[in-house]
Regions:
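Short aromatic-glycine-enriched beta-strand elements
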Residues: 25-29
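Walker A/P-loop
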Residues: 191
Length: 313
């Protein structure tokens, strides 16, 4: 259990730390010796995110963030009409969906595009493998994503349920020595997964919420959990399965972020083909030949229009 530090002796020396929770502009920082304290940003633009490595200075009420170290990557989510970063320095993203209730393919596609844009490896976890018929239907729905090279991991996340232990063993191998952000809509089993992987997670979440003054049952905090005592593997939990921030992406970049579309762009007659109406379009030809899912192509058109409108403002 972390050692909480409400206040430290004032010191002019900078200290290293890891941001393990955030709520608004307040963050919880884990120090190099395992202590935790509340830190506040210095200035409006010095906003730290969960996963950030920072340099902080002790103050009377905790610490102030003096420097955010260079980030390997950033993941974004949507905030009204803007894209807003919410996690940094990830090795992979685990997108958890379930056989029931039926998942939104649009939300899944957006999450994958956000990961591709940030150069973060995505994994898809398909939960409720114990529901044979719905699971078979959901697995078929994910076949285009397997064809794109995305790994789909079957899971049965049910405390004490048949297949749960073997599911977790296989997943733990994927999480080993990595920082993984886990995302999923309501009903996908994200809370169950976290509680199975991290005994005492609920109590720790309550302590963090109290420390950040957000209330014990907050749903707005992004939280970092260590998966092992050696602190080599970590899981980041972010609330909900919100629309992913894609408005920072230029429309012309979109085909390269959708592997099934990108595969066929080299066959287009025109270098600036939008893949919507031009003659000699390799992407449209691939749709007609059944090499690209019609639903995926439809989503490409919808998102291209959305990004084109967003980039006008």
């Amino acid at each position: 259990m972390p050692c909480w530090v409400p206040a430290l002796t004032l010191s002019p020396e900078l200290n290293s730390g890891l941001v393990v929770a955030s709520h608004g502009r307040h963050v919880l920082v884990e120090t190099s010796d395992g202590r935790r304290l509340i830190c506040h940003p210095r200035g409006k633009k010095n906003t730290a995110l969960v996963g950030d490595r920072i340099q902080w200075l002790a103050t009377g009420d905790g610490g102030s963030i003096e420097k955010i170290e260079a980030r390997r990557n950033l993941l974004y989510r949507q905030d009204e009409i803007r894209s807003k970063s919410f996690a940094a320095n990830l090795d992979q993203v685990l997108i958890l969906v379930a056989a029931e209730p039926e998942f939104s393919e649009s939300q899944l596609a957006r999450a994958l595009i956000a990961a591709e844009a940030a150069h973060i490896a995505p994994l898809i976890g398909l939960n409720k493998s114990d529901l044979s018929e719905p699971f078979a239907h959901a697995s078929l729905k994910l076949e285009p994503y397997r064809c794109m090279g995305y790994e789909v991991i079957p899971l049965a996340l049910k405390p004490g349920g048949a297949g749960t232990e073997s599911s977790l063993d296989g997943l733990k191998d994927k999480l080993h020595n990595k920082v993984t952000l886990v995302l999923g809509p309501s009903g996908a089993g994200k809370s169950t997964l976290i509680n199975l992987l991290i005994p005492g997670a609920q109590a720790l979440t309550g302590e963090i919420s109290t420390a950040l003054n957000t209330g014990r049952h907050t749903t707005t905090s992004t939280l970092w959990y260590w998966l092992d005592d050696s602190h080599h593997s970590a899981l980041i939990d972010s609330p909900g399965f919100q629309e992913f921030g894609l408005h920072h992406i230029e429309p012309v970049q979109l085909p390269a972020l959708m592997p099934d579309i990108q595969t066929h762009t080299g066959n287009c007659r025109f270098y600036n083909c939008t893949h919507l109406h031009e003659p000699g379009c390799g992407v449209r030809a691939a749709v007609e030949l059944g090499h690209i899912s019609p639903r995926r192509y439809e989503f490409y058109g919808e998102l291209l229009q959305e990004l084109s409108q967003a980039n006008r403002y």
